[in-house]
Amino acid sequence: MAFLFRIRTSEFILQKATQFRLKSSSSSIFTLKSLTSKQKKSRDTLSLLKSENNPDRILEICRSTSLSPDYHVDRIIFSVAVVTLAREKHFVAVSQLLDGFIQNQPDPKSESFAVRAIILYGRANMLDRSIQTFRNLEQYEIPRTVKSLNALLFACLMAKDYKEANRVYLEMPKMYGIEPDLETYNRMIRVLCESGSTSSSYSIVAEMERKWIKPTAASFGLMIDGFYKEEKFDEVRKVMRMMDEFGVHVGVATYNIMIQCLCKRKKSAEAKALIDGVMSCRMRPNSVTYSLLIHGFCSEENLDEAMNLFEVMVCNGYKPDSECYFTLIHCLCKGGDFETALILCRESMEKNWVPSFSVMKWLVNGLASRSKVDEAKELIAVVKEKFTRNVDLWNEVEAALPLPQ
């Protein structure tokens, strides 16, 4: 009997487990379908917004979609809507969108909703509303934490109001009993560096030390960037020594900051010498390193060096991104090397990366001028297939091409 009972019990457990798996599988499929439906709706909304300038219509589109700041595409939707409204000077509509967004959230309201609104007000250059939203969090029954403080500092950065950022940093933590964290200090270092007061960032590092918060490579990277812009190279070396003292690894990301600064100052050869020195110390550059150098040499119209770096990059197993291709194609067209530009353009389009209409037109006309009309028409055909909205423009370009010889 005991044996039969165990068999029946096992059969019962197996049956229940099977039912649970089926139910769980059904639930997962339902969740996946819901997520897919949400993604499609959000992407359709984003597509609509990109072609809309009417403030009432923008508000209507946003309100008709259940937007969440926790979802990446929805954050883009809010950014596009706010930037468009601010560009057209529809500031009242910006307030209606963001304030309504917070107020209409179900209770308990999440701080993440307010954080997004604070940042977007800064992006719209409506910093007073960022501050007001931060101060009014109790009215919305939203907890105020260091996340809101960091969002307010970021809003100041976006509005480029460095004086207000300094006031927020000095006053708000004491006023609201908020303890700054690593992100707070890094934001303040960035404020000082962007405002041309990088030397003052040493005091922030000292404050971090007092609070037992260790600066990171990102903290020191901001300072290096700031000192490079101010051409204080002795200070750059000082920061590098500080990194060693704090036990912070000087990795390729730190060198990339220096390379970017040198390339922006039209010193790409110096940047390349720097990375050659790094490689001799057995530190490998990454794809960002090569992209920065390629962009730098292109901006100095040194195509030979740019193409050489591109070849080295690919041979070393790194994958160029779309911007790397676009930069090279533009510079090759500018230098009159349409044949090489065509090779890179084909590679780029195989990855579904198509340069801008103006660059593509430049390339097409350049090929035609070199008696490569067939190649030009082939390129037009591929672009027309991928981007149907520009078909009429490409038909005009194609009609103006000379007949093949």
UniProtKB/Swiss-Prot annotation:
One of its GO terms (cellular component) is mitochondrion. Belongs to the PPR family. P subfamily. PPR repeats lie at residues 74-108, 110-144, 145-180, 181-215, 216-250, 251-285, 286-320, 321-355, 356-386. It is found in: Mitochondrion. Transmembrane segments: none annotated. Keywords: Mitochondrion, Repeat, Transit peptide. Residues 1-72 form a transit peptide. InterPro entries: Pentatricopeptide_rpt (IPR002885), PPR-containing_protein (IPR050667), TPR-like_helical_dom_sf (IPR011990). Gene3D superfamilies: Tetratricopeptide repeat domain. This is Pentatricopeptide repeat-containing protein At1g11630, mitochondrial. PROSITE patterns: PPR (PS51375). The keyword Protein transport does not apply.
